[in-house]
A protein has these predicted regions:
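Hydrophobic transmembrane alpha-helices of multi-pass small-molecule transport proteins
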Residues: 110-127, 265-282
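Structural signature of hydrophobic alpha-helical transmembrane segments
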Residues: 20-35, 74-91, 133-146, 205-218, ...
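Helix-helix packing/entry segments at the starts of transmembrane helices
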Residues: 30, 85-90, 157-173, 221-255
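Transmembrane alpha-helical segments that form core, pore/gating elements
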Residues: 13-16, 24, 39, 132-195, ...
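Cytoplasmic-side transmembrane-helix entry/capping segments in multi-pass membrane proteins
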Residues: 1, 53-63, 107-120, 136-142, ...
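Loop-to-transmembrane-helix transition segments
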Residues: 1-2, 48-73, 135-142, 193-222
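Hydrophobic/small/kink-forming positions within alpha-helical transmembrane segments
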Residues: 5-13, 40, 62, 66-70, ...
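C-terminal transmembrane-helix exit sites in multi-pass transporters
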Residues: 91-113, 248-267
Length: 284
């Protein structure tokens, strides 16, 4: 799991490097398109056995996952890598809230404490001492919420859909939606705040950019494989705790790429979110 966390942080660093040449929407497209073909190949050779039957939930999983990813890549491009990764890691806190309201799961006292701790962590990172937070930090938090919504949806369909079909819903939407936005981009006069959604597809990149794209796709696949392997070999609560080590890894990679080192308030916020995530993991 520690290796998975390191690889995940490296994947974030590669994405940040690519933001100099690719838009956030292009990153989402290239992140998913290869996976679609791989999953389709496996489904052709080993058809799924589960019946499914709730396509709307399958689509919602894909939509929430796509929304989380586009916001994640946007925040990687606009704020320090460590902060972007940390805000994305608020998803376990949001999962607890969604599970309580939508799935009627019990919320223990430890989980409630974790939510409060995590909330204060968000406050310290975004530093809204002037009663406002930056647009980029807000989208980072929203990305964490969408990731949580995707995880909550998986809980509803994991017993009726093959895992590969669930993955395909995410990667399929993550491939189709960018194509739609690419087609609309020349005809939409979007506000500056939404420019990351309607960036035009370039298609012509230097060779080194293609190398980084291919490397990112491989690293992403390796990270998912290591994560799956870790969950199959250890308790989910332990894995959840160790997964937060990708935050210090990300801070280190971000610093090497030119990010400013986190100040006292940011470090405090990161620590509180990690603590909140650990408490949530231990409460399960």
């Amino acid at each position: 799991m520690l290796l998975s966390a390191l690889v995940s942080a490296l994947n974030g660093a590669l994405a940040k490097i690519l933001t100099d040449d690719l838009s956030s929407m292009e990153l989402v497209f290239f992140r998913n398109v290869l996976g679609v073909f791989i999953i389709l190949y496996t489904l052709k050779h080993t058809p799924p056995t589960l019946t499914g039957g709730k396509f709307h939930l399958l689509f919602m999983r894909g939509f929430f996952g796509f929304s989380a990813m586009i916001l994640f890549f946007y925040t990687i491009a606009t704020i320090p890598l460590g902060e972007a990764i940390t805000l994305n890691k608020t998803s376990p806190l949001f999962v607890s809230i969604l599970a309580f309201y939508l799935l009627k799961e019990h919320l223990s006292k430890r989980a409630i404490l974790a939510l409060l701790v995590g909330f204060f962590g968000i406050i310290f990172i975004t530093k809204p001492f002037g009663m406002s937070i930056s647009y980029e930090h807000f989208l980072g938090i929203l990305g964490g919420f969408f990731a949580a919504a995707a995880y909550a949806t998986i809980k509803k369909i994991k017993d009726i859909y093959d895992t590969r079909v669930i993955m395909l819903s995410f990667m399929g939407v993550g491939t189709l939606f960018p194509i739609i936005f690419f087609m609309l981009a020349p005809y939409v006069n979007e506000p500056e705040s939404l420019s990351f959604l309607f960036a035009e597809f370039q298609g012509e990149y230097e060779f080194k950019v293609w190398v980084f794209i291919g490397f990112m796709a491989l690293i992403s696949t390796l990270s998912q494989w290591l994560l799956t392997k870790a969950y199959s070999m250890s308790k989910a609560s332990i894995i959840g705790v160790i997964s937060y080590t990708n935050i210090p890894f990300s801070i280190g990679f971000g610093w090497m790429l030119g990010d400013a080192f986190p100040d006292f308030w940011t470090f405090t916020g990161i620590g509180l979110i990690i603590l909140g995530g650990i408490l949530v993991s231990k409460s399960k």
